Amino acid sequence: MRIWSSEHVFSHPWDTVIKAAMRKYPNPMNPCVVGVDVVDRNLDSQGRLHSQRLLCTEWGLPSLVRAILGTSRTLTYIKEHSVVDPVEKKMVLCSTNISLTNLVSVDERLVYTPHPENPEQTVLTQEAIITVKGVSLSSYLEGLMASTISSNARKGWDAIEWIIQNSESTVS
C-alpha cells in the first residue's frame, strides 16, 4: 500500500474554484478522461449538493506494467461521489476505481476549502491510497502509480485554472 498526499493553493475564491472543479472534465490538460456521466445529483435537507458520477479513463500503462499485472485493458471506470456544502464552504470528493479491482485499488479524497488566512484563495488537499494486489513488484508498481497520480494532480490544477480563465474570458 502506498499513500500519496498533496496540498495546492488556488489564487481564486472558493466559489470560483468549485464551479470550475464541477466542470473539470473534459479538458485538454488530461485527455485520459474520455467520459463522464452524472449518475445522480441531489440536494439534501441542509442544502448540500451530492453528486455521483462515473468516469471512464484511458490508462496509458506501459506494456511492461500491463504484462506484470496480466491485463491488456487500458479503459478503467471510476466511481466518484462529491458533496458541496455552500454554507461551510467545503467540497469533499471521493473516488475509487470500479474496474481492475482484482489487481489494483486507488481510493482518492479531495477537499476544497477557503484559505484560512485569505478568502480570495482556495486550498485543495488531496490524498490517494494505492494498493496493487497479488503480483510481485507491487511496491514498485504502487510507486509508479503514485508518480502518475502526482502528475495527474498537477494536470488537474492546471485544468481548473484553464476552466476559470476560459470562463472569465467568455464573460468579459
Curated annotation (Swiss-Prot):
Keywords: Lipid transport, Mitochondrion, Transport. Its main location: mitochondrion. It is found in: Mitochondrion. GO terms for cellular component: mitochondrial intermembrane space. In vitro, the triap1:prelid3a complex mediates the transfer of phosphatidic acid (PA) between liposomes and probably functions as a PA transporter across the mitochondrion intermembrane space. Phosphatidic acid import is required for cardiolipin (CL) synthesis in the mitochondrial inner membrane. PANTHER family: MSF1/PX19 RELATED. Interacts with triap1. This is PRELI domain containing protein 3A. It comes from Xenopus laevis. The lineage of its organism: Eukaryota, Metazoa, Chordata, Craniata, Vertebrata. The gene is prelid3a.
